[in-house]
Amino acid sequence: MKRTEIQQLLNEYPLVKNLMELEEIFWFNPCNTTLKEGLPFVGLGADDVEDAEARLDRFASYLCKAFPETAVTHGIIESEIVAIPTMQKTLEQHYGVGITGRILLKKDSHLPISGSIKARGGIYEVLTHAEKLALQAGLLAENDDYSKLFSEELRRFFNQYSIAVGSTGNLGLSIGIASAKLGFNVSVHMSADAREWKKQKLRSHGVNVVEHELDYGVAVARGRKEAESAPNCFFIDDENSQTLFLGYSVAGGRVKAQFEQMNIVVDEDHPLFVYLPCGVGGGPGGVAFGLKLAFGDHVHCIFAEPTHSPSMLLGVYTGLHDNICVQDIGIDNITAADGLAVGRASGFVGRAMERLLDGFYTVQDQEMYNLLGLLDRDEGIRLEPSALVGMAGPARVSGNLDYLNNKNLSAEKMKQATHLVWATGGGMVPDDEMTKYLATAKI
């Protein structure tokens, strides 16, 4: 961006200056509206989510066989929700803010197969593609027992096809592991910030890892180019895929069912706040969409990003979406939150979801490490840095009276609120890597 263009941007959107200075900010989204008004802009509906849920149910018997660790949940890839009462007290002291209601942790960090939120969308898109190919070839019918896909005959069939994806790490893990298990030839284009252990894990599953010295956007572009030039190659587009988005959106109904089992009420007097780490936007966007369908206007979805990679906040705040990247305003897009190191957010997700999101905030890298250390100390739960950006959310919301007043969230309602922090990854981090994370925490 030219200096004059940046100055014009600053004149119109003063918070851009705070972003450029890498400050931690909270921005309440004035475009936020009701589900009824916002839903038409998404281009998807409850029927699409139900279709995704049904597809995952069909694949449950296959997943049980292919990944025995899913047998305990009968082939359903789902995570538990846990209370973190000691951490809640610590957060109040840490931020000097009273947090009423209850903080819960959604442990997508410990999802089976790939240990992150990407096990939802990534694996779902691979399964969707596999189903389509097998149905077209007459090797599968929708009323079949899908465990038949776990056979040498089907592996040989899928081996004629390849899959490519660009990733900062976790999406590549989920797609690589699931694709290789089915028999696909799979290439994962990894950006410069991808962790070495994630590359090694993929290689151990027979995945072709292509390393790039530049950021996420380049990795995606190279993956797309490879798919265009190779016959029978399917590219999974993290920036624009509605299939990925729907895989994540199934989480909304699942959370609703879990809350019912836990006797947690969500209504006008019992608001639900969900804090979602955001990279390119597909994961949090899909989850937020599913939550909105499940809980309507009683759920308040808030995206959290690193100060060095606030791509979705920048895109939605300026209305430029994927026509601007953080590098345009001089931000380096280098962060310890490797899963969130995205300079240019998804234009599809930003435009689809901007009216259904309450707000956005940013967190510094050191603060992620500090929260990581506190959570380990208080609750014995270990996450990767990017999964901790959501942990700052309850204090940010509780301390923002303008936001609470605007949303008519009285002190009485906040006493009955549920704060759900979405832990996006970390369950498979090797011990030596985790030791380094913990050593970086200042607590």
Swiss-Prot record:
Protein name (Swiss-Prot/TrEMBL): D-serine dehydratase
Designated gene of the protein: dsdA
Ranges annotated as spanning the membrane: none
Oligomeric and partner information: Monomer.
Catalyses which reaction(s): D-serine = pyruvate + NH4(+)
Organism name: Photorhabdus laumondii subsp. laumondii (strain DSM 15139 / CIP 105565 / TT01) (Photorhabdus luminescens subsp. laumondii)
Enzyme Commission (EC) number: 4.3.1.18
The protein's required cofactors: pyridoxal 5'-phosphate
PTM-bearing positions, type N6-(pyridoxal phosphate)lysine: K118
